[in-house]
Regions:
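Core catalytic alpha/beta fold that binds nucleotide/phospho-ligands
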Residues: 1-120
Length: 120
């Protein structure tokens, strides 16, 4: 089985959400490790946000069926992005037989995008 998901977001939307909601925004959408790795850079947070949406699309459920923190976007030892699933997202991936994930992130000052592919 092959599944894919893609998402793009305006970085300004993330900036606006941070200004409007502050720590509540961070705590709702990102794990502590994601926040540490993003180093306060809004484009990096926007790319992670887009990646979570893309993973949910690849799972075939949309983000409403899984928790935002059930999908974690981190860096591996070579600083490449990687997907770690927890909770409902992990259970859904297992039920679909999805075992390997690949992710590509990109951002400018205006937009961030993510493409994910899962195979099983």
């Amino acid at each position: 089985m092959l599944r894919a998901g893609v998402d793009i977001i305006e970085v300004g939307r993330i900036d606006a959400a941070i200004l409007r909601h502050g720590d509540r925004f961070f705590n709702r959408f990102f794990t502590l490790q994601e926040l540490i790795e993003a180093e306060g850079r809004t484009p990096a947070l926007a790319a992670r946000f887009a990646a979570k949406e893309a993973v949910a699309k690849a799972l075939g459920c949309g983000i409403g069926a899984v928790g935002w923190k059930d999908i974690e976007i981190l860096r591996d030892t070579r600083r490449r992005p990687e997907i770690r699933l927890h909770g409902t997202a992990e259970a859904l991936a297992e039920a679909l037989g999805l075992k390997e994930w690949s992710i590509s992130l990109s951002h400018t000052h205006e937009h961030a995008m993510a493409l994910v592919v899962a195979v099983g």
